[in-house]
Amino acid sequence: MDKEARIISHFTHALNGDDGALLGDFVYSKDLFIENVHFKREWLSMQGIGAKAVLVNLSDAIAMNATPLYALLGLALPKELENDEIDALCAGILSTCAKHGVSIIGGDTTSADKIIISLTIISKANKKTLFRKKAKIGDFIAFTGSLGLSLKGLKILQNGGKIARNSRFIKPSLRIEFMKKSAKILTSAMDISDGLANDLPKFLGKKGAKISAKLSKNQWLSGEEYELLVAFSPKNKARVQGFAKQTRTKLTIIGQVKNGYLKIPKYRAFKHF
């Protein structure tokens, strides 16, 4: 058991283990966004840091087909930050929240030796809430968008290069419209944050899968993609593909859910610890 799994095992509860927790009519989700873990200050503008912190948090709610409404913000900042840097960071957070209809209703601030942003998103559950591990035997497995672009951008930055402000690493794409249209016929969903090689086993739970698509190493390993990983019945294949076309969302079917084991390439996948 790796350290992340060990930590999580101490806090098992019927409501956790998914992208968010469904409690009554609301879904609660949280992600941390930490300097030198998820980003370096020289890679993103302060406004870009604030914006991405919000986007990666909204991704969990969208994967569960919930509508984000409110946020609680925890903000720890180094004392050496200038006022204009603080203003830019807050502007990125606020403008991105406003764009997605989210109001910040509380939180806390403190000092730290690096930037730490913690958001708790409170979302309205829609008619059908989607969870991990609910795919049925025979269901197709697919992901939205293109995987590998976030890792490509990260490698460029690590080598001292520059990437476009709208690159996947800086600005993840949230598949809101696709989810709104397709949720009613999906059986399971989650967002891809730790790379497909890490997230597919979490998505399937105790089920296996036959992977028919030929994917590159970067597609398997690229984290912080925030694309959707979804499952749906073969009888709904044409409808899901139709919704993808209507919303201009690339959709790649990679295999089907099966009894037995999941066989994926043995790459060294990302670990938090």
Regions found by a protein language model. Name each.
Residues M1-F273:
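Helix-biased detector of long, well-ordered alpha-helical tracts
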